[in-house]
Amino acid sequence: MLGSRAVMLMLLLLLLPWTSQGRAVPEGSSPAWAQGQQLSQQLCTLAWTAHLPMGHVDLPREEGDDETTSEVPHIQCGDGCDPQGLRDNSQSCLQRIHQGLVFYEKLLGSDIFTGEPSLHPDGSVGQLHASLLGLRQLLQPEGHHWETEQTPSPSPSQPWQRLLLRLKILRSLQAFVAVAARVFAHGAATLSQ
């Protein structure tokens, strides 16, 4: 009986290096949960306070899965962003958040936002873009690259489409960063070393 326990212990010890090499955060470090919490809260605040020049507009709820909503990243149950998933292996969740940030970074840099002269780079959308970039860079340290799904570049939009597209993008970004902020708040409270 003692021999089988020793064999099991040796097998576990042999497996440890292999599991740690699959992490998205480099070996020997953990995500900067507190910094991620701060950046994600700032991003969340900016997403909710980004004012576009046309004032407040209520968008009707859309039914179905059209082309603009099918590509939008969502943090889902299988992404490991729940408390147990974060405790076991936070990398799946952090990679999903990173993918979403890349997606929204491309949208905020597209002609949907840059094609409007009244949206200055130092305005609220520019600040939102810079904050999003800061959080994305925190999740992907220099010299460390995650395999990401190919994020399609947005196709050029017509001027008449941009107002509605901006509103839809900001609405989905608000939902995405709200979940990401909760993930980082939980990580900062329970997983920081």
Curated annotation (Swiss-Prot):
Alphabetic keyword roster: Antiviral defense, Cytokine, Disulfide bond, Immunity, Inflammatory response, Innate immunity, Secreted, Signal, Tissue remodeling
Compartments, record wording: Secreted
One Pfam entry name: IL23
Signal peptide: 1-22
Stretches that traverse the bilayer: none
Cystine connections: none
Keyword Secreted: yes
Location (main, coarse): secreted
One function term, GO molecular function aspect: cytokine activity
Annotated Gene Ontology cellular component terms: interleukin-23 complex
Family of this protein: Belongs to the IL-6 superfamily.
Name of the protein described by the UniProt record: Interleukin-23 subunit alpha
Gene encoding the protein: IL23A
